[in-house]
From Swiss-Prot:
This is Protein IpgB. The gene is ipgB. Gene3D superfamilies: 1.10.4120.20. InterPro entries: Bac_effector_IpgB-like. Pfam families: IpaB_EvcA. Keywords: Plasmid, Virulence.
Length: 208
């Protein structure tokens, strides 16, 4: 699959009501960036201890390959791509509800999945997907490498911050693993997903 070689930050957002009908692709991206809160979540540079993302990524990939030898690896890749991208969509929908109090209808959620499938026709999606194999393996690697213990020691007085650090680190490693295995950018996927979520919110707000 070929994805635009344009890296844009993953962001949290607050929503005015933009108009999308007459926007070209470049204008749409600018519009998204203008209405989203440009607080970058990744990469987070300080986890309370030295972190080598590439080293963790490579260890995760080795473990995935060890667990899925031969043709099994291709089956795993097909399923994981479905699960990973679907989970990105579900996470963006959930974040919209958490940060902005906007709960999308079932139909609007389906429309988001359909729009992403149309943009990336070689990716099959599953609305029920949640935790991915990559994320699970990344979390285990962070623990077994001793990083989790170091981060816990640093943030033991604030468990909310510890959990946030672990979530951010796991997501950062997972994104790096996905990018490497599938040779495509999760950041580009995320901006496309965020655009569709934002458009769904706009449509829903105009029908209520």
């Amino acid at each position: 699959m070929q994805i635009l070689n344009k890296i844009l930050p993953q962001v949290e957002f607050a929503i005015p009501r933009p108009s999308f009908d007459s926007l070209s692709r470049n204008k749409l991206v600018k519009k998204i960036l203008s209405v989203f809160n440009l607080k970058q979540r990744f990469p987070q540079k300080n986890f309370g201890c030295p972190v080598n993302i590439n080293k963790i990524r490579d260890s995760v990939i080795d473990k995935i390959k060890d667990s899925n030898s031969g043709n099994q690896l291709f089956c795993w890749m097909s399923q994981e791509r479905t699960t990973y991208v679907s989970s990105m969509i579900n996470r963006s929908i959930d974040e919209m509800a958490i940060h902005n109090g906007v709960v999308l209808t079932s139909d609007n959620k389906k429309n988001i999945f359909a729009a992403i499938e149309k943009k990336f026709p070689d990716i099959k999606l599953d609305e029920k997907s949640a935790q991915t194999s990559i994320s699970h393996t990344a979390l285990n690697e962070i623990a077994s490498s001793g990083l989790r213990a170091k981060i816990l020691k640093r943030y033991s007085s604030d468990m909310d911050l510890f959990n946030t650090q672990m979530k951010d680190l796991t997501n950062l490693v997972s994104s790096s693993v996905y990018d490497k295995i599938f040779n495509e950018s999760t950041k580009v996927l995320q901006i496309e997903i965020s655009a569709e979520v934002l458009k769904a919110v706009y449509r829903q707000s105009n029908t209520n």
